[in-house]
Amino acid sequence: MFAVRFDPSQLVEESVEDEAPKKVIPLKRSKSDEEDESSEEETESSEDEEEKEKEEVADEDSMDVDDESSGDDDEEAEEGEVDAASDHPDKHNSVMSRFQQTLALQDKMDSESLVNENEEVNDENIVESHNLERIPQPAKVKESAVAPAAVSQYKSAAWLNTETIHYDSSMVRKFSDFEDQIDPKLLKNIQQNFSTDTFPIQSILLETLLPTLNFSYNITKKNFTRRVGDVLVNASTGSGKTLAYSIPILQILSKRTVNKLRALVIVPTKLLINQVYETFNNLAQGTSLIVSISKLENSLKEENKKLLQNEPDILITTPGRLVDHLQSGAVNLRNLKFLVLDEADRLLNQSFQNWCNELLNKLKTDKQDHMPGNIVKMVFSATLTTNTEKLHGLQFYNPKLFVMDSVKLYHLPRMLQEYNLHIPTAKTSYKPLFLLRLLSEINGSKMLVFVKSNESSLRLASLLSIMIEHKLGSQFDINSVNSNNTKAENRRIVNEFASNNNTSKVQVLITTDVMSRGVDINDITDVLNYDVPISSQQYIHRCGRTARAQSKGTAYNMLIGKGERTFWATHIDNDISRDIDGCQPQVWGQHDQQNQKDEGQEEEAQVLPLLTVDPETESIYKECLNSLKEKVDTNRK
């Protein structure tokens, strides 16, 4: 058994309470202890060990005595306890004295020495520092300038004071009919670089805006915008919207004397920036107007310096870049007269640093005239949003809404022919093969193939190339625009596709919906929806890449099974109007029994071979799929 742990303070208290305490004689120290402090500690430690040994022996003896004398009288036991208690002070007095000396030394020690010891210990745990920089963070998005309580009111009041103006496809005029309203230099540039005839949307806009603009500007150059009001246009793609808003802007700005930022054009993509810039630049030939662009590819510092040194009359940019310039102070909106939103539905769905509120707040800060109608807002889209809350956030003033004379949401060009390819569900896996066969039947075309993702674009292009190598189809020029390519490579592919005029070979560009907006390539003959678009709005933008500028075009829709056919009929076709004398959608694919009864046997004989797969073709097709799988696995490694 182990001895009870010794408590020095308890012994001191017991010795004080004794009536006749014994005189304690401390142990004498040796001379060597007094001379050398270190030797004193050694002897004391040796004495401690001896005393501890004696104590342990005494405890063991006392335990043995207790066991042997368990049957003795109580008086003897009491005498033994008194003797043991009287022996403790003699044994441990030296320990107590040494303990008290240690406490006294600690009180006298310099506090700085203790701190230094702690610092030395902490220094060992210090990690070497590196030259790290703080990660740049985007600016805090400001709250909406519109009170939340007013949002519900705006939803119902967005179209309260809107004047609706209808137009139709028959409204085509000569630009020379507007020679009284258009500057001679501007009219000459239009006829030389664009066309002598107007498109319907151009006709109705020029008829409505030009007389009011010219009259108001002649009366007051400062407040002419109030008589005009804002403009909202819903027009199909390829209908000449860019030229429609460029002509009125240049008609007014061509009369200016000092260059100030008076027109701001906001577009959703960089591709559209270049196309809008080209339109303005061609129209502004022979004038002193300065047209500038701003996009993320350029250095922000260099653009700021350029804008401050030589302020442009017209600036074309994207929402994110615009916010950067507004926050840096390089763009001042004090003299702004025209604000254009091209592809407005996509712009309003984007929230680049809350660009819309940033722009409106900047207008309130910079403009000295805070009255409504201090600028003319022009909103253009092929699928103008029906979300009135988003539109009302732009705070329109006496808006005029220009829409096609139709009860449907959207309108397709008159010369666009649509074909639906009905593919049975059991043959879904052969969809790339059917696409290749369709391409073989189309001669001398330039086709855009739309898929749902970048990965699908990359894999479909690779599989088509492999099938062509295995002689499953004719030789084509097949390229894809996807995220695996660099921006420069994608731009090169698009430019080569646009500039290639070789009509002897089918040119195919596989892409996603990025190419469905803002790509002005007038000679695209065909559009193929390999994956069904998710909405009628997306369908309009895809098909709008062809049949532009009143030219012919074809759109193919690959519909698998009854589900996709029903979706196209109920969610896409129901929202679209077509001209009575224009092209109507037709079925090209495997017909059901009802269609076979209605259609002639001649057309049936033409269609069925497209979807027929013989055993030999099936075997080669499976080899192509295995080759694609091996290629994908190799690229992953």
UniProtKB/Swiss-Prot annotation:
A motif (DEAD box) lies at residues 342-345. CDD domains: DEADc_DDX51, SF2_C_DEAD. Keywords: ATP-binding, Helicase, Hydrolase, Nucleotide-binding, Nucleus, Ribosome biogenesis, RNA-binding, rRNA processing. ATP binds at A235, S236, T237, G238, S239, G240, K241, T242. Residues 222-402 form the Helicase ATP-binding domain. GO terms for molecular function: ATP binding; ATP hydrolysis activity; RNA binding; RNA helicase activity. It catalyses: ATP + H2O = ADP + phosphate + H(+). GO terms for cellular component: nucleolus; preribosome, large subunit precursor. Its main location: nucleus. InterPro entries: DEAD/DEAH_box_helicase_dom, Helicase_ATP-bd, Helicase_C-like, P-loop_NTPase, RNA-helicase_DEAD-box_CS. A motif (Q motif) lies at residues 198-206. Residues 33-84 have a biased composition (Acidic residues). Residues 1-93 are annotated as: Disordered. It is found in: Nucleus, Nucleolus. One of its GO terms (biological process) is maturation of 5.8S rRNA from tricistronic rRNA transcript (SSU-rRNA, 5.8S rRNA, LSU-rRNA). Belongs to the DEAD box helicase family. DDX51/DBP6 subfamily. ATP-binding RNA helicase involved in the biogenesis of 60S ribosomal subunits and is required for the normal formation of 25S and 5.8S rRNAs. This is ATP-dependent RNA helicase DBP6. It comes from Vanderwaltozyma polyspora (strain ATCC 22028 / DSM 70294 / BCRC 21397 / CBS 2163 / NBRC 10782 / NRRL Y-8283 / UCD 57-17) (Kluyveromyces polysporus). The gene is DBP6.
